């Protein structure tokens, strides 16, 4: 039996994740069969998705109201304070829950894309601290990282795959139009690690195909 590499698994499951998201509400009927228990509703009034971490009472209600993102945690022992973010100029694509640092407590990640032709991706994420409270997760900007930003012009896709965060985007060569990138796809895999002032997503592997 052929052994599947972490890159192949990430690419495969990301494709499944994005295809599932594109199907909209039809896929939500089977959400309880997935590892992440979710309830999602997208309407003209905004985005609403409830995520519960399997085997625990910890959950997050992710919603929008106007240009505000609202994250309401529940099941934490110390603080379940509501979290607010101004998302003017962005649209929420999806939200996921998972345990990226394998500490038995979840992270909640919300994926956004900028309005306009570039569709630059953005992550708003939180990590649970020993079941007591949450702190924000930091994802360095692709545009600020010279090791991976060559040919980057947005159109990001993001997903949690097991305990890895994956981000991929088309690579543009000089002269490419926005609608026709010719440089293939760059996929970045991150691990969640403890930083000096909080948890950060650190690049673990970069693959182009």
Where are these regions (language model features)?
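Repeat-based blade/solenoid architectures
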Residues: 85-94, 145-152
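Acidic/hydrophobic-patterned starts of short beta strands in beta-sheet-rich repeat architectures
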Residues: 102-112, 163-166
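Short, solvent-exposed loop/turn segments at conserved positions within beta-propeller repeat blades
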Residues: 64-66, 117-120, 180-185
